[in-house]
């Protein structure tokens, strides 16, 4: 098994440790403190599942931070 997973994050290629969770990716990108929607392979990953959803080689991830204002 490969030690890295080659994934796409918001349109950019990225290598992450094999088995990294969506929550781990958010932490690596400093997005773990802000509200953030996550989608893996066009499927929404609820916040409660982000720590247990692991990333695999070839996954396409979209992370969208939520910003309020008016």
Task: Identify the meaning behind each predicted range.
Residues 1-69:
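Ubiquitin-like/PB1-type beta-grasp interaction modules and other compact soluble beta-rich domains
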């Amino acid at each position: 098994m490969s030690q890295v997973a080659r994934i796409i994050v918001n349109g950019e290629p990225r290598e992450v440790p094999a088995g990294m969770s969506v929550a781990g990716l958010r932490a690596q990108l400093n997005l773990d403190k802000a509200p953030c929607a996550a989608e893996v392979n066009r499927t929404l990953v609820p916040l409660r599942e982000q720590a247990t959803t692991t990333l695999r080689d070839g996954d396409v991830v979209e992370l969208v931070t939520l910003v309020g204002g008016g």
